[in-house]
């Protein structure tokens, strides 16, 4: 029986623990301050998430019991309050079409300025500047994004290097083939020139031989003719009669 009673007490205590907290003023000052800090941070976080996820213009103003101001705005608190005042006045006095267009363009311009400011802040964070406004979780996310970006950059660089190496290898093979082709053409041309030189040399030798033999024969014929024209001293001396003195 005692065991069953203890189990019932434990179950009832668990149900009470899982129950909703009664919303009322916390009398204990310390507990109230701790709860204020927790709820304030949660509210600021929710306001930030709402502005980012839904692209909403959010302004949050909190005063503690001691009069300390806490605020958050994705644009500016003053600008959002002025927009709120104008929206309230427009509800009483509906704007004209021109005023509505002006308000629309002003909102678009404000949105673009906000986007530009966010991009500029992100660029500064990527460069390692203005990091004092980031908490540990945001710094961790920034580090992860930078590591992923560096990994993609290195992968792209490696891909380009591999492509460049492959191109250079193909180019080297093409140049080697061109070099071999040129060498073969030079060798072929050199062989033809040598053959032409040999033929020309042989023809020159042949012509010089024929000319020499012809000149030698001509010389012999001339020599024979000259000999024929010269008198034969022996025969002339024999045929002439001896002179007689009277």
Swiss-Prot record:
Q: Which domain of life is it from?
A: Eukaryota
Q: Which compartments does it reside in?
A: Nucleus
Q: Which UniProt keywords apply?
A: Developmental protein, DNA-binding, Flowering, Growth regulation, Nucleus, Transcription, Transcription regulation
Q: Which GO terms describe its cellular component?
A: nucleus
GO molecular function terms attached to this record? DNA-binding transcription factor activity; protein dimerization activity; RNA polymerase II transcription regulatory region sequence-specific DNA binding; transcription cis-regulatory region binding
SMART domains of this UniProt entry?
Answer: MADS (SM00432)
Subunit relationships:
Interacts with AGL15 and AGL16.
Q: What does the UniProt record say this protein does?
A: Probable transcription factor. Interacts genetically with TT16/AGL32 in a partially antagonistic manner during flower development. Is essential for the coordination of cell divisions in ovule, seed coat development and endosperm formation.
Q: What is this protein called?
A: Agamous-like MADS-box protein AGL5
Q: Which organism is it from?
A: Arabidopsis thaliana (Mouse-ear cress)
């Amino acid at each position: 029986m005692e065991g069953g009673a203890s189990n019932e007490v434990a179950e009832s205590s668990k149900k009470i623990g899982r129950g909703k907290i009664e919303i009322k003023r916390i009398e204990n000052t310390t507990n109230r301050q701790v709860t204020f800090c927790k709820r304030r941070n949660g509210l600021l976080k929710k306001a930030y998430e709402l502005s980012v996820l839904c692209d909403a213009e959010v302004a949050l103003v909190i005063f503690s019991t001691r009069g300390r101001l806490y605020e958050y705005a994705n644009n500016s608190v003053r600008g959002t309050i002025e927009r709120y005042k104008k929206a309230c006045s427009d509800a009483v006095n509906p704007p004209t079409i021109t005023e509505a267009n002006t308000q629309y363009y002003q909102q678009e311009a404000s949105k673009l300025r906000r986007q530009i400011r966010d991009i500029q802040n992100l660029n500064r964070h990527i460069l390692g500047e203005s990091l004092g406004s980031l908490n540990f979780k945001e710094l961790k996310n920034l580090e992860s994004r930078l590591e992923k970006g560096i990994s993609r950059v290195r992968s792209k660089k490696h891909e380009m290097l591999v492509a460049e190496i492959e191109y250079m290898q193909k180019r080297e093979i093409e140049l080697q083939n061109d070099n071999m082709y040129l060498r073969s053409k030079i060798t072929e041309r050199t062989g033809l020139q040598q053959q032409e030189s040999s033929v020309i040399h042989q023809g020159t030798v042949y012509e010089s031989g024929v000319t020499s033999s012809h000149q030698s024969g001509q010389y012999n014929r001339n020599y024979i003719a000259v000999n024929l024209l010269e008198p034969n001293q022996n025969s002339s001396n024999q045929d002439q009669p001896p002179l007689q003195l009277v």
